[in-house]
Amino acid sequence: MYSWEKTKNRFSYSFSRRGGINAAFGNLDKEDSWQQHFVDTYLEGYRIGDPNKVEIMAKEAPSIVEEIDNWGSNFAKLKNGKLDQRFFGAHKYRRTCYSGDFTGLSILKTLLK
């Protein structure tokens, strides 16, 4: 079993990410959708990304984020128990799920359990 505590080099791009992870749940903005997530991501990526892969990511992001949350990641929650979301980057709607300012660390610790 991999132990987080035994890891000597804990710096990585994922570890240092503070903003959050995007998924179009529509918990705060009911108009949000995987289609809008696709558009925001594809356009903000200067249309460099493979549209088919960006579409898959936008469609599957909610189920992946829910799965990580169910494994014990410490995402912020609304009073109704749903994931809280905030604006981040150039996205049209609040879709960034976060764990304070330590989202990357929270996700990595969860995945390494």
Predicted regions and their residues:
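Conserved N-terminal/central alpha/beta ligand/cofactor-binding core
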Residues: 4-113
